[in-house]
Amino acid sequence: FRSLGAVYQNFKYLAMLLSIGKDSTILFWLARKAFFGHCPIPLVHIDTTYKIPAMIEYRDRVAKEWGLNLVVGKNQKALDEGMNHEKGRLVCCEALKTQGLQCIMEEHGYTGLILGIRRDEEGTRAKERYFSPRDKNFEWNFKDQPPELWDQYKTSFAEDTHIRIHPILHWTELNV
């Protein structure tokens, strides 16, 4: 996978996830380099309310100073119903992150998401592809993945899918 510029040209409704962690920050830096100091791709931050205030202040300050299109999503309903980490990591992440992202995608019509994940982070991510389809329920069939050989990628998918694009998938912790 070589070019964020090509991805930007080929996906009509594209956004980039920004968790404010090291990987998404590197990805944002790469996007700014690809677009000569500007990032034309909307940045989506899913606010779980668990980030330290200094991170949120940094996010807001950078977005304002650099004129970024920052979209902040939050599953307020789940938070109002008492969702928190004490209910279990998987349950909490599903409610606050996944459902929060689903709401933002529906609201803004995004069909492509750029993420800063790496294969070496976790077992399931080792099965990811640079262009990874999800169905309308955000389900991913990891058993039915097309090969990605010699920089040839499948980039067209069924109508009801959105595509997750992973530019730094091949990076390691040391690369970051």
Where are these regions (language model features)?
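Nucleotide-activated chemistry modules centered on ATP-dependent adenylation/adenylyltransferase
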Residues: 1-176
